[in-house]
Amino acid sequence: MAVGDVTMPHMHVVNGVKIGSTEAYVRYPNRRDLVVFKFVEGSHVAGVFTQSAFAAAPVLVSKKHLAESAIRYLIINTGNANAATGQTGVINAQKTCTKLAELAGVESSQVLPFSTGVIGEQLPIERLLDGIQPALQDLKDDAWTEAAFGIMTTDTTPKGASEQFELDGVVYTMTGISKGAGMIRPNMATMLSFVATDAPISQSLVQTLLKTTVEQSFNRITIDGDTSTNDSCIFVATGQAGGVEISSEQDPRYSKILEILQRIMNRLAQLIVRDGEGATKFITVAVEGGENTQECCDVAYSIAHSPLIKTAVFASDPNWGRIVMAIGKAGVPQLDVSKVQVWLDDVQICRDGGAAADYTEEQGARVMAQAEMTIRVDLGRGTAKDTVYTCDLSYDYVKINADYRS
């Protein structure tokens, strides 16, 4: 059961984007599991992908196609990751692009393939290929919610975000979806996300915007510390709402676009954590007082990855010794522990490296019992800060992953 508000918002139509989906029976019966995006000619498309050395076949093909061509289509299947499938997997990903391209009248290099699901099994390629025509016949501009359902695996809820905004008197839209609930620790987490706007943005800035916003969103979440083979995030600017193209970071409209995209990306990333496998609590880990951002990030992830801390949060057990343990093993050079402060929300549990004199277990337990809480750490050695989002670790996480081949 997802934590907090995960309501699917009204998903505004993005001019220049059409979406279709179908039941291809890649793995799941009686549900949409194949999704196609179509972008108007002239759209600018950017992508970032998993840093796993075991990158899946569709990731390899997508990166190659992005470097070669102007992208017109995306095709996404769920239920099978097409990862650790060797050259056959690459050929199958290419076959998918070729079949869609033939039906749509574009080059195969103008198609990006994406897969999510079980690793190590070959795609049921004939079923997938047979599903492409029905998905193309289903193309429409108001199918973002259907697409969000269509890319789910162990997710319990579809994930979406959408905003409309005005720049120089022109109303624009930005809409996106994501999926993921386990195998989530990005550098880039199994995480897929697709965001589009009808604002006019140059190709170079589309890539800059994506890299900038992913760093503080999808690269700042973790559920279980495992990095997927298939992580992919795509940002598209169709330019179909009109206006002069934004081609410089000095353009005053750029900062507004950046702000909105960051908000959309943050929401999509945090929805993944809220829907973490077996999650009952949403945890913000905020670390400040570092000499640099990297050491703050390292400490935050050390806390967020700790199964001892995550199980303590699940049990509402304010065992703060586990938090200082995680700080200590984060590898901060020459950390003066006598300057370290730790809070659970506004309750200080550690002062100057030891137990806060006025802290009581009852105070800590009350915070830990909340559905949402913040673990805040001050390293006392500088002004840098960073934040990571995670969830607790429950019995259900074990059950879900014992029952699901992932």
Curated annotation (Swiss-Prot):
Q: What is one Gene Ontology biological process annotated in the Swiss-Prot or TrEMBL record?
A: L-arginine biosynthetic process
| Compartments where located | Cytoplasm
Provide the catalytic activity annotation: N(2)-acetyl-L-ornithine + L-glutamate = N-acetyl-L-glutamate + L-ornithine; L-glutamate + acetyl-CoA = N-acetyl-L-glutamate + CoA + H(+)
Annotated site residue numbers, Involved in the stabilization of negative charge on the oxyanion by the formation of the oxyanion hole:
T116, G117
Q: Which UniProt keywords apply?
A: Acyltransferase, Amino-acid biosynthesis, Arginine biosynthesis, Autocatalytic cleavage, Cytoplasm, Multifunctional enzyme, Transferase
The active site consists of T190 (nucleophile)
Q: Which GO terms describe its molecular function?
A: glutamate N-acetyltransferase activity; L-glutamate N-acetyltransferase activity
Quaternary structure (record): Heterotetramer of two alpha and two beta chains.
Q: Extract the PANTHER family matched here.
A: ARGININE BIOSYNTHESIS BIFUNCTIONAL PROTEIN ARGJ, ARGININE BIOSYNTHESIS BIFUNCTIONAL PROTEIN ARGJ, MITOCHONDRIAL
Q: Give the protein name, as stated in the record.
A: Arginine biosynthesis bifunctional protein ArgJ
Organism encoding this protein = Acinetobacter baylyi (strain ATCC 33305 / BD413 / ADP1)
Q: Upper lineage ranks?
A: Bacteria, Pseudomonadati, Pseudomonadota, Gammaproteobacteria, Moraxellales
Q: Which gene encodes it?
A: argJ
